[in-house]
A protein has these predicted regions:
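Sec-dependent N-terminal signal peptides
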Residues: 3-13
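Beta-propeller-forming repeat regions
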Residues: 16-663
Length: 663
């Protein structure tokens, strides 16, 4: 039986729309000395492959792979060690390598730099050519049958070759079905995650001896280890192993064997208080580095210093992680950032606050001016005496337990209670809206711990992963969100913790304003901002989106339906396919939008969304399918201007006078 064309296309959805910024646009740069800032590739995720002395420095250089974006292996030259002990590296160079992720890089005693890679059911050995900056294949062999579909490998060297540890799945299967359907239910009626809990374990392939399971159980690390490193922690611990994990634990195995493996029971790497450390973000991989280890997953790279001490549990004790640094770095806002511009420290110039998928709120201090801004690398905003970090936890993500470590925090700031200082209101992965009241001063914010906002005594709740728009209108504070019906909805402040219903916002033709291109995982992901873009005195919406957003309706909305194309066929045939293909199967990427207010601030009504185009009439799409924020701002002079982000944490300030918003 012939399959419908759209079903055939589903099987070949392999390409996506390409990002576009105006020619010459550069990411905002770090204004710290030597441009130092957190080391992060232009990727969602990182895999630290290992280190080697390539350039002859005092400390080793670093090999890092990126994915979730352009996939490549990068080499970072060591240049310094910062005061807090974190290594500092130069800008990366791309290494020619046929393999991008499932590998481990190490240096033999004679100086040769070796890369071992998993290529489906084969193990590939490569050697690094320093002159050509290339990993050249030298050997390829079948993996033993017991090593079935390994996800990562770790290497312990010995005089006879390599002792290899492979990460394998226990075969557990998660919830059935698609998160993009009404039928999706990741939790049962008792609130418990459905499906089997997926765990990983280790199998060893020693230089001498049999291939065998080397961990005590097949239920070692939930969901993913994401990487394995051999590490020398001193006498009696020269050949231990540490793995990463989906949830951010670093998992330690003492190896008693002088060759091969004799692993003890797993232990969670401890902090100096004796409690298990938890990486700041999801999915850290790990690699030993002199003095400790480097870990990275989603987000930037971190260095953990080994203290030389051991916890009562038998785990090694490491210091709290500090950022690995790069010179001449872009400002880094974390993955899927959602920014706002306010004078956070009361010095008369606009700073940047940004939330991200890790769940932090970051403060980028402007040490320049509004016309010529210069920003220092971020510090994390605190509330109630602790860093703000909002994450889904066990049941806070509609896509399931495996998303417990994501937050997708989207902050906005306004003087909510008219006491002269800025407060924070946030949306996040849960769809809830929280307020952080500022009890400090204009120059030194001091936020209370988060409290819910209520409407009619019910927690204010809407679509997940959205940002609230805030404005002062006629002496009252207005708040707009994407509500539970998937519509733009206005609320008015009653008091510090309560709002009243202001009604659904509408288009100028009277229709409601829808948001999502689908249900479940295809819903929400909309970052609203009140801003007078056309300077007519009426507040418009500037909107950050993901690719599955469809404003104002699923049939014609932006960007998904209006800009989406089939990812397979171009030209005339492609245009015909586009007309026949359901919108949810078309591909585009997150696109900043503006919706002009054709009414007044007191009686808002909005025109259909418009895209921003550059002087060559090309649509501005900073990069990424998930979602990022976009706000109007007076930063940069001759405003209004547009501050946008790609999902890899870079921010871009675009001059408004070089942007077009005509239909």
């Amino acid at each position: 039986m012939k399959q419908p064309l759209y079903l055939l296309l589903v099987a070949t959805l392999c390409s996506a729309a390409e990002p576009h910024l105006p020619p010459g646009t550069k990411a905002l740069q770090s204004a710290a000395p030597n441009g130092r800032g957190p080391l992060a590739l232009v990727n969602l995720n990182h895999h630290v492959l290992g280190h080697a002395r390539v350039f002859g420095g005092k400390q080793p250089d670093l090999f890092v792979a990126g994915y979730g974006g352009p996939q490549a292996v990068h080499l970072f030259k060591w240049v310094d060690t910062s005061e807090n002990g974190a290594p500092v590296f130069a800008e990366p160079v791309v290494v020619k390598c046929a393999f991008k992720d499932k590998g481990s890089v190490f240096q033999r005693d004679g100086g040769a730099v070796i890369g071992l890679w998993i290529d489906k059911e084969e193990l590939v050995t490569t050697e690094f050519d320093r002159e050509k900056l290339e990993f050249r294949e030298t050997k390829r062999e079948k993996l033993p049958k017991a090593v079935k579909s390994p996800s990562s490998l770790g290497v312990l060297t010995n005089g006879e070759g390599y002792d290899l540890a492979f990460e394998l799945s226990n075969g557990g299967k998660g919830a059935e079905g698609s998160a993009n359907t009404e039928e999706w239910r990741p939790f049962n009626s008792s609130g418990i995650a459905v499906g089997e809990l997926r765990y990983r374990y280790l199998i060893g392939w020693p230089a001498k001896g049999e291939v065998r399971q080397i961990t005590k159980t097949k239920r070692e690390v939930f969901f993913s280890m994401h990487g394995i490193t051999g590490i020398d922690l001193g006498s009696g611990h020269e050949r231990d192993l540490i793995t990463g994990s989906r949830q951010g634990n670093l998992v330690f195995y003492h190896n008693k064997a002088e060759g091969g493996f004799a692993l003890g029971t797993k232990r969670l790497v401890a902090g100096e208080d004796g409690n298990a450390l938890r990486h700041p973000s999801i999915n850290p991989s790990v690699a030993a580095y002199p003095g400790g280890l480097i870990a990275c997953g989603e987000g930037s790279l971190y260095f953990y210093r080994f203290t030389g001490k051991w916890a009562k549990t038998g785990a090694p004790v490491f210091a709290e992680p500090v950022s690995v640094l790069q010179e001449h770095a872009d400002l880094y806002a974390g993955t899927l950032p959602s920014p706002t511009t306010v004078d956070w420290n009361g010095d008369g110039v606009l700073d940047i606050l940004a939330g991200n998928s890790e769940g932090f709120v970051l403060f980028f201090e402007n040490v320049g001016s509004n016309d010529e801004p210069k920003f220092l690398p971020a510090t994390r905003v605190q509330a109630g005496g602790r860093e703000i970090q909002v994450q889904a936890g066990y049941s806070g993500s509609l896509q399931g337990l495996q998303e417990a470590r994501w937050g997708y925090l989207s902050p906005n700031a306004i003087d909510w209670n008219d006491d002269g200082v800025l407060d924070l209101i946030t949306g996040d992965i849960t769809g809830n809206y929280l307020i952080y009241l500022n009890r400090g001063t204009k120059t030194a914010a001091k936020l209370d711990a988060a409290r819910p906002l209520y409407c009619d005594g019910i927690d204010l709740h809407g679509m997940w992963r959205c940002r609230p728009a805030l404005a002062k209108i006629g002496g009252r504070i207005a708040l707009a969100i994407v509500d539970g019906d998937d519509h733009f909805h206005l609320y008015w402040r009653i008091d510090d913790y309560n709002v009243e219903d202001g009604g659904k916002l509408k288009l100028d033709d009277g229709r409601l304003i829808g948001t999502s291109g689908g249900v479940g995982g295809m819903s929400g992901r909309c970052k609203l901002d009140f801003f007078d873009w056309n300077q007519d005195g009426a507040l418009d919406f500037v909107i950050g989106t993901g690719r599955v957003v469809a404003i104002p309706d699923r049939e014609t909305g932006y960007p998904m339906a209006a800009l989406g194309q089939n990812p397979v066929v171009g030209g005339l045939i492609g245009s015909l396919v586009d007309k026949a293909l359901p919108a949810k199967l078309k591909k585009t990427i997150g696109t900043p939008l503006v919706m002009l207010n054709t009414g007044t601030n007191e009686a808002m009504k909005f025109a259909r969304p418009l895209v921003f185009r550059d002087e060559q009439n090309v649509v501005i799409q900073p990069g990424g399918a998930h979602e990022t924020g976009a706000v109007g701002t007076l930063l940069g002079g001759n405003g209004p201007n547009l501050l946008i982000c790609n999902e890899a944490g870079r921010m871009f300030l675009l001059p408004g006078n070089k942007l077009q918003t005509t239909p």
